[in-house]
UniProtKB/Swiss-Prot annotation:
Membership in a protein family: Belongs to the WD repeat G protein beta family. Ribosomal protein RACK1 subfamily.
Name of the molecule in the record: Small ribosomal subunit protein RACK1x
Tissue: Widely expressed.
InterPro entries: G-protein_beta_WD-40_rep, RACK1-like, WD40/YVTN_repeat-like_dom_sf, WD40_repeat_CS, WD40_repeat_dom_sf, WD40_rpt
Gene name linked to the record: RACK1C
Ranges for the WD repeats: 13-53, 61-100, 103-142, 147-188, 191-230, 232-270, 290-326
Subunit structure: Homodimer and heterodimer with RACK1A or RACK1B. Interacts with GB1, MEKK1, MKK4, MKK5, MPK3 and MPK6, but not with GPA1 or MPK4.
Signal peptide feature range: none
Protein purpose: Minor component of the RACK1 regulatory proteins that play a role in multiple signal transduction pathways. Involved in multiple hormone responses and developmental processes. MAPK cascade scaffolding protein involved in the protease IV and ArgC signaling pathway but not the flg22 pathway.
Molecular function terms, GO-annotated: MAP-kinase scaffold activity; ribosome binding; translation regulator activity
Length: 326
């Protein structure tokens, strides 16, 4: 019996591209999504046939597209970054903004929490990476010199707490690895031929994967700063994530969601959306007229137990895939 992914359900509430999905580390029945509709939605997962989850709360306050969202490890707070140039910390119990982080001079494209939630990092079109405390104070800005020469599209903390590390990806085609203790450059990873949209760090902190315009995923050894190998995705890569419990890497591309087994370096899954069958299911057997439109996945994240893959699309829909056997 092979393991594969099947579409378990869909979640509708956003009215524009779903830019990011955050899942709780305790596997509780919530997720948080961000969108170009300028809102963040807290979902309660019901796992019903008709709808996999319901929008419990919509967090509003950003004045432009929300580009990224992450959850604190206790699941109490969400942190977002927006094209309005700000980060916001949200109390999920009340839906209120508890902190605004002001300092970037252009769109914020990416945000992340350190493992202990005491540090926050953000990346922007102003070409800087900023390190903040949870009070909203900017403690350090990585800019000129070793900094990126173009938009910084993605920034992530390594889960390896022994060697505190930040990894960033940029439109200057490089991935940079930073020592968190002194914010100094450890390695500059060169090999891509186009701008980068995304970087992901493996659960053990040993690897990172990067992708973007050139349609090639590069895998890097984080400790050594060396390229290990490449995987051909075949079209622009918008998001990457590692499975928490299988040696799998998932890529959201403009063609499909592609999943590789990193041991064999083979594609185990290539997930495409069937709008026709989705419409029929939704309308109770009557297809709708929008099956011609091209949609693709822009964001994805696994549940903490690795059983469920949440994927956000350009049509504002969150599609939920579950591990099945066939």
């Amino acid at each position: 019996m092979a393991e594969g992914l099947v579409l378990k359900g869909i979640m509708r509430a956003h009215t524009d591209i779903v830019t990011a999905i955050a899942t709780p580390i305790d596997n509780s029945d919530i997720i948080v999504t961000a969108s170009r509709d300028k809102s963040i939605i807290l979902w309660k997962l019901t796992k019903d046939d008709k709808s996999y989850g319901v929008a419990q709360r919509r967090l509003t306050g950003h004045s432009h597209f929300v580009e990224d969202v992450v959850l604190s490890s206790d699941g109490q707070f969400a942190l977002s970054g927006s094209w309005d140039g700000e980060l916001r910390l949200w109390d999920l119990a009340t839906g209120e903004t508890t902190r605004r982080f002001v300092g970037h001079t252009k769109d914020v494209l990416s945000v992340a929490f350190s493992t202990d939630n005491r540090q926050i990092v953000s990346a922007s079109r102003d070409r800087t990476i900023k390190l903040w405390n949870t009070l909203g104070e900017c403690k350090y800005t990585i800019s000129e010199g070793d900094g990126h020469k173009e938009w910084v599209s993605c920034v992530r903390f390594s889960p390896n707490t022994l060697v505190p590390t930040i990894v960033s990806a940029s439109w200057d085609k490089t991935v940079k690895v930073w020592n968190l203790q002194n914010c100094k450059l450890r390695n500059s990873l060169v090999g891509h031929s186009g701008y980068l949209n995304t970087v992901a760090v493996s659960p053990d902190g040993s690897l990172c994967a990067s992708g973007g315009k050139d349609g090639v995923i590069l895998l890097w050894d984080l400790a050594e700063g060396k390229k290990l190998y490449s995987l051909e995705a075949g079209s622009i890569i918008h998001s990457l994530c590692f499975s928490p419990n299988r040696y799998w890497l998932c890529a959201a591309t403009e063609n499909s969601i592609r999943i590789w087994d990193l041991e064999s370096k083979s594609v185990v899954e290539d997930l495409k959306v069937d709008l026709k069958s989705e419409a029929e299911k939704n309308e109770g057997g009557v297809g709708t007229g929008n099956q011609k439109k091209v949609i693709y996945c822009t964001s994805l994240n696994w549940s903490a137990d690795g059983s469920t893959l949440f994927s956000g699309y350009t049509d504002g829909v969150v599609r939920v895939w579950g591990i099945g056997r066939y």
